[in-house]
Amino acid sequence: MRKPQLLAAAVEALHDRGFSATRIADVAQRAGTSSPAVLYYFGSKDELLEQALEYADAQAYDAWKRAFETLPRASDKLWFIVESSAYQPTRADDWTLWIEMWARALRRPKVRVHYERLDRRMRLLIAEVIREGQAAGEFGECDADGAALTLSALLDGLGVQRTLDHEDLPPERMVDLCLRWVERELECDLGASEVNYWRERSEGDPSSARA
């Protein structure tokens, strides 16, 4: 039994059952192995959650990087970040595990450190895209790190509402709100009303560039 298989099973179990209701046996059953085999890799449920989130986060991060290779403009990359976050194409991309992590991080310093490291990696990637756009003349001058932090927080907050199926926040509304904030902050025109780009393209090639 390979560790990535166990991590994929852990992501599914935690997504479906939540942290408190998930047992090591649940992960083992989904992975088609034994509880001792799971415990060989994960010494505790906290460690299981941490590594499952890191696995899911790495998948999302790698998907962004692969998509960026096909997107020539920084504005297209920001658009992709926002829309892929709103439409949640796979379980690994949604906020369910993050919500579980936030709850644990409130009272467990070790979990908090782990969360902060993963969150920082995503924010640095967003800041890198913003600086790329500034260098290319696509975006106006601003604090790239501050803008990345704010956009990340906006995505997180609205992402929680999307995860809870808030009736006032369909995915296209989330995209529109985020892109309009980006346009104001970065003094650019992303065409914020074209909110179906990522969803339509993802039915074919999710890495396709916006026309």
Describe every region a protein language model picked out:
Residues 76-77, 90-113:
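Amphipathic alpha-helical segments used for helix-helix packing
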Residues 5, 9-47, 51:
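Helix-turn-helix
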Residues 47-49, 81-88, 113-120, 142:
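A ubiquitous short alpha-helical element
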Residues 54-59:
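Short, basic, alpha-helical segments at the C-terminal edge of helix-turn-helix-like DNA-binding modules
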Residues 16-20, 71, 136:
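Short coil/turn segments at alpha/beta junctions that flank glycine-rich nucleotide-binding fingerprints
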Residues 51, 62-95, 147-151, 175, ...:
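Hydrophobic alpha-helical connector segments
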